[in-house]
Design a protein with these regions (language model features):
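C-terminal subdomains that position terminal phosphate/3'-OH groups for nucleotidyl transfer/ligation
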Residues: 1-199
Length: 199
């Protein structure tokens, strides 16, 4: 019981909402934190290298010009149709721009937040990501097992499914054949590197 997030506990037990509603609100809360990182990336590129490092691994390197699309796409796939709500919350709790002391200052602050919301929303729609959660994987677990030439599933296949989503976000026009080719090449390259490291 101690593992249940406090927000979820309050919503489910105190407010007596359905478990699915509680989960949705917790997901919005989590996504709004991730949006804070995304806003920084979209507005200034300040954390580009940090985000890129999170997305990359030995099998997949995201091209620098596609980091924004992949990172935003992963957040939207988690939060789905509630992404605008999560973005709105993130903008509200975002560190304030300057210290507004008078009413005019507060109005300026609100205007800045409104502009920021519109700007980030436009960036996401320009990246063609609204509805990205409906994107079907080019390969299912069975097909991945075939490409990897393994007999059973497990964590390995799960990791490849996550990589596959990133690859598709980075290659929106990519075909199943191109995806399989990338997987084979990545696997071979990784094996070569491991052999070189051990010799």
């Amino acid at each position: 019981h101690l593992q249940v997030p406090v927000v979820s506990y309050i919503i489910r037990d105190f407010l007596k909402l359905k478990a699915s509603d509680a989960d949705t609100i917790v997901n919005i809360h989590v996504a709004s934190e991730k949006f804070a990182e995304l806003i920084l990336l979209l507005e200034s590129n300040e954390n580009l290298e940090t985000v890129k490092e999170k997305l990359d691994d030995e099998y997949l390197e995201i091209p620098t010009d596609l980091v924004k699309r992949v990172f935003a796409g992963l957040i939207l796939r988690e939060i789905k149709g509630f992404w605008r709500v999560a973005l709105f919350i993130s903008i509200l709790v975002y560190p304030e721009v300057g210290n507004a002391s008078d009413s005019l200052g507060k109005q300026d602050e609100l205007d800045k937040r409104k502009e920021r919301y519109i700007s980030v929303e436009r960036s996401i729609t320009n990246l063609d990501l609204d509805g990205v959660w409906k994107m079907k994987p080019l390969l299912d677990g069975k097909a991945i097992m075939g490409v990897m030439q393994v007999k059973s599933g497990g964590p390995l296949i799960g990791k490849w499914q996550q990589r596959l989503v990133k690859w598709q976000l980075a290659h929106p026009q990519g075909s199943m054949e191109e995806c399989m080719e990338w997987m084979k090449q990545s696997e071979q390259q990784s094996k070569r590197q491991k052999i070189e490291c051990s010799t």
